[in-house]
């Protein structure tokens, strides 16, 4: 079955994969995908030429067809992060929020993996380049658990092939 496109929260493009895709084949759980689709901003860490980290706020969307996280933004192909990924594909993305202040409850998803710089432009010449992250390690906190005692929330970590 072909992939379906739609609009997610905030009017962002959402790509759905084939209906035959099972959760076991997906790098993210259903709850993690829902969390990502509800967020508009993440922080992308890449490696600069001198080996130091660069961390920038970025737009994002989950690509269920490929099981990747696509980083989007204006003039992406001219950005330092795009050049960093072109040179060294190691990257990490953190998406977090405060779910509650009473009691204090935070949630986050950290995705470490291999990133690729994907050039692109539309017929009008606009830059449509993206950074595509292929998850290799996923850390989540407060995503899978129902609201409850915050001190019982545990970090979940898993490595992917």
Q: What are the residue ranges of the model-derived segments?
A:
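Short solvent-exposed loop/turn micro-motifs enriched in small/polar/acidic residues
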Residues: 37-39, 52-54, 108, 124-126
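Short, structured beta-strand-loop surface elements
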Residues: 75-131
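Short, basic/aromatic recognition patches
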Residues: 14-43
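A generic local structural motif
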Residues: 28-31, 56-57, 78-80
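C-terminal edge-of-domain segments
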Residues: 2-23, 118-161
